[in-house]
Amino acid sequence: MAERSFKQEVEKLRLGPGEEFRGEGILAVTKALLQCGVGYVGGYQGAPISHLMDVLVDAQDILEELDVRFEANASEAAACAMLAASVHYPIRGAVTFKAPVGINVASDALANLSSGGVTGGALVVVGEDYGEGSSIMQERSHAYATKSQIWLLDPRPNLPSIVKAVEDGFELSEASNTPVMLELRIRACHVYGSFMTKANRRPTLSVTQALNEPKRQTDRIVLPPASYAHEQEKISQRWPAAVEFIRSRQLNEVFGAASGKIGVVMQGGMYNGVIRALQRLGLADLYGETRIPLYVLNVTYPLVEDEFLAFCKGKSAVLVVEEGQPAYIEDAMAAILYRARGSVQLSGKDVLPMAGEYIGQHVLEGLTAFLARHAPEELPAGTAQSQDKPIAESGNNLSDAVPVRPPSFCTGCPERPVFSALKMVQQERGSLQVAGDIGCHLFGSLAPFEIGGTTMGYGLGPASNAAFDGGGSQRPVSIIGDGGFWHNGLTSSVGNAVFNKSDGVVLVVDNFYSAATGGQDVLSSRAENRSKSTGHPISAAVKGIGAEWVREVNDTYDVATMRDTLKAALDTDHEGPKVIVASSECMLNRQRRERPVVNQTIAAGERVVKPRFGVDDDVCTGDHACIRLSGCPSLSLKILDDPLRDDPVAHIDQSCVGCGNCGEVADAAVLCPSFYRADVVHNPGWFERLRHRLTLGLIGILQRRRSRRVLGFEPV
């Protein structure tokens, strides 16, 4: 169950010629694919492009009507390998995944695809997970474009430009027999807007038809001597064809004055930021009209040399706004100017940050510095300074005004008790060498658990601990999620451990979904999926690959059992890897699934019991060990109105979802017995209501009796 449903929104994909589409960026990309006559689509979920996969899943009926093959691939490599269908056949295909980690995984298939070239249009839609909101290492997709000679599109972040980029991408790919990457930044994926639609097109050749008439071209296979010819073909044929297409179709855009003393070159994705900075300087109006010449690179690779030189003609200085590092575009343009003996002064990273996302303030400051140096007459006196001060001051004070809030597990997360159990084991036995993996469980490396020190790639947690299997007083422990397990972990981590007779402990955290990417189904998901095969146990897979010591914990909230199973894995004399599969459903997905049903049941007048937990103020000792071992967001502190008790007690707020982890932790760690469970009954029966009234009456009598026996002191 994905975190977001597009069942209603996908109906917009049926819009016909001349109708207006209003919606989100990823939905617009899907509509553009259908308008282009795509024959097959695939991909692997991952922010910021996860919702594109969710849209495709919810649009399967529409895809089937158009004879479009859709596949939710096991990994980015599997997705990219799908594009092999466009090598010999004139079929348009598109795949999607996040970048750069997705491209890292897909790089082998991507390089082979680029070497042999394509006949049909091949488009890779990458979500550039860079800057604020990113969850990965900060790198750029540009390196892969230049390494494998794949054309890179970076459209202006508005729906008409994005839709046009999809259309241009397919045509550019076919014109140059080269795959194309379409880069969408985080905000571009979710930008809202409108565009005029065209009719959806069935593929001119479907994959079904192609299967009935197989084709092969030996010279397209990446095998010597053909692979040597591929490299020469890239330079002599494909590159010139791409440059001519970009130039003739005017994929890059020029705005502002036709001539001027200075100019600004930017990636298409930076256009909005540059225009906003110009507006703040009084050099552009609300509609983006400006007198500053702008050269917008909707295609950032390859560059069109004569086009760039024409833009530079008559200018004394040009600013390159290129987000991230290295400065691929700026360096390439500097080389172009050098070869052309140009006299233009090129500026970029000297006035803009070398690395990191270019927020509005960065672009404003860089543009201001550039203008002050090369065209001070264009800079209104005092404009930038008057606008900068409040922003700078508020930024400096922000860390003082807002407390640090590191990411953590969700309330009720079934992975929290796993780390509580592991922390108890470490408190008893000393620190363990723990390797983490990509996924929600990586939050265990932060407070209050602070377990795990590395993450080397999706599904590579156990493999990253391989060097520590050489003995020692404690066995190494590796943590991997079910999503990472099926993505890469079964072979690269568990299979590797079996083959090398690893003595380590592999802890597979199974929450029934690829939860961190949005709750998509995986092979071991328990839900029935009409188009996918689910219900394949992880334990069966690890046994099938050769692991012998395998234990299952089917309720991670049972902290004592979880702790004891970990101890058993650390103590056993069995040779080979010790695998623990700890399973409980992701609380977010469980709430999405159960809450509508519960609300309907309550509305229908039926009896529903909801568990809630609390802390007895009189019993709580105030040492807060429960908070340190649990870290649940629902656990907070409460100051008592009691002069004899200085320390605040633990308190459970209304965000509690009733998972019971707090009580289980207190019981397993033998803490104070202050936690209690209270059942909230909706639509109780007559007997329950009567018992409730009698109970309240009895409690009132006892409280009044107690009050009479309390000593009182009269003021003197």
Q: In which residue ranges do the predicted regions lie?
A:
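Thiamine diphosphate
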Residues: 1-159, 187, 257-260, 265, 445-579, 587-592, ...
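Flexible, low-complexity linker and terminal segments
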Residues: 2-26, 30, 156-409, 414-415, ...
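Short acidic, glycine/serine/threonine-rich loops at helix termini
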Residues: 52-56, 82-85, 105-109, 132-141, ...
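Short helix-loop-beta junction
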Residues: 55-62, 277-293, 540-546
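A glycine-rich helix N-cap at a beta->alpha junction
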Residues: 61-72, 115-127, 206-213, 499-512, ...
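Intrinsic disorder at enzyme termini
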Residues: 604-618, 668-716
